[in-house]
C-alpha cells in the first residue's frame, strides 16, 4: 500500500489588523444611521451645485418618507427599483428609502443607451424607475409597455411623477418590515471575469460587513470621523462610490459633498471652499490632477486622504499626485463588485497607520481571508509567487441573479471568490496586482465586456468574425480595440465600424481602433486566444 498523503493546507493571508465585531444582523440602513444620536444635527449632504445642505436627521427622515412613498406606489418587500441618476441628494434618499422598504436598488449608468438600460430593466425585473427628465426618453416606451412607474427628480414630463411625491409621504404610514440579513439590498451589474453583464446580488449582511471592515473598530482600516468632509465625485451607480462614499460616509458620520460630474476647475474650487479632507478617486481623476496646470492655483492643504481604486495606479502617477496634496496620505484599494467590493485597502489610511509601498493596493481587509492560487492547479501559493487572487468572507456577493452557472464558476464550493486577477502578496502582507486572467477591459475604471462588443460587431452584415481586447492608453488606462474579419468581397472601413458601434453603446464602450485580419486566433474548443491578440498589440505587429 502506498503512503497516505495528507491534503495540502491552504496558505491563507489575513489582515494585519485584528478582527472586529460586526453587527451583521442589522439592516444596512439601520447600521448606517446607528450613530445618528451623535451626529443628527450635523451636515450630512451638501449639494455642490446649489449649496443646499441636509443634516443627518433630515437625511434619515427623508429616507423613511421615501420608503413610505414607495410602499404607497405598490413597491413590496423584495421588489426592485432602478436608479438611473447622476450623483444627487435624491440618490441617497432613493437608495436608503428602498432599503427601509425592504426593496432592492439596481443602479444603471444614466449615459447608457436606451438598449443598454432596457436590457438591465428586463434582467432585474425593476418595477419602478427613478431618473431625470433628460433620460426619460430612454425608458418611456418600455415603461409604458410594462406598466413601470417613472419618477423624476426634476421637472417631470407627462405620465411621470415628481420625486417630491415620495418625500412628502407620511413616514408613520410605512408598515413594519422584517429584513433578513441575507436579503438583497443592491443589484449592481458587472461582467465578472467574463461574458455579459450580470446582476450582482449584494445583501444587507454583505454591505454591512464590507463597510465595517473599512471604517469600524478602534483602529479602522479607513479612518474617518465626523469632522471630515468627503467629496462624492465618483458616480454612485458604481459600487466603489456607493460603498466607500454613501455607506462608509454615513456610518462614519462625515459630511458628503456631492458633485454631479468631474470638471477640474469646479472640482478644485469645491475642495478649497469646503475644505475637503477625503478624496475617493479613480486613476483618470488622479491623472487629471497630476497633469493640470491649474491645480497649483488652489489650496488643497485640507485633504488628508487620497484613495484610488477601480483600476491600478502606477508608481509614477502616485508620486506625481503626492506633490499636489501636501498633507495627504495617498494609497490604493482593490475591489471587485462581486466581492462587495473591497478586498484590500492601504493601511496608511488606518487610525494608527502603517508604512506602505508605492504600487501596492493594500492588505486584505479584516474579518476576511485571502489566498493566491495557481490558475492551472488551484493549489495555494506562498508569498511572492504570482497567482489568481481569491477572497472569502461575509462581504462577498450572494451570487449572480438568475445565473447559478456563473455563480458556481466564480464562487467555489469552499466559499472562495475567484477574482480573475493575477497578483502576489509580499513579505509585508502587501498585495500587488500584476495581470488579469479575466477578459474585462477597464476604461477609466468602467467595465467593458469584450463579449458584449463582439456580439454587437457580429450583427454587422459585413463582419464575419470579431474579437475585442484592451490596448494600453495613458489617459483611460485601457481602451477597447477590435480585430475584425470582413465578409468576403466587402471593404467596410474602420470608421464605418466605429460609427456602427458608437451609435449603440455608452461612450466608454466605443471601439478606439479596428484592425482587419484574415482570421481570429482560437483554441481547438473555439475560445478566442486573447493573449495572442494582446501580444500583437504589445509588439506593434499590427495589420495596416
Swiss-Prot record:
> What do we know about what induces or represses this protein's expression?
By fungal elicitor and UV irradiation.
UniProt keyword list: ATP-binding, Ligase, Magnesium, Nucleotide-binding, Phenylpropanoid metabolism
Q: Which residues bind (E)-4-coumaroyl-AMP?
A: 240, 310, 332-333, 337, 345, 438, 442
Q: Does the keyword Nucleus apply?
A: no
Name of the gene this protein is made from: 4CL2
Q: Which residues are recorded as binding ATP?
A: 190-194, 198, 332-333, 337, 421, 436, 527
Its cofactor is: Mg(2+)
UniProt GO MF annotations: 4-coumarate-CoA ligase activity; ATP binding
Which pathway, per its entry? Phytoalexin biosynthesis; 3,4',5-trihydroxystilbene biosynthesis; 3,4',5-trihydroxystilbene from trans-4-coumarate: step 1/2
Q: What does this protein do?
A: Carboxylate--CoA ligase that may use 4-coumarate as substrate. Follows a two-step reaction mechanism, wherein the carboxylate substrate first undergoes adenylation by ATP, followed by a thioesterification in the presence of CoA to yield the final CoA thioester.
Protein name, per record: 4-coumarate--CoA ligase 2
Q: Which organism is it from?
A: Petroselinum crispum (Parsley)
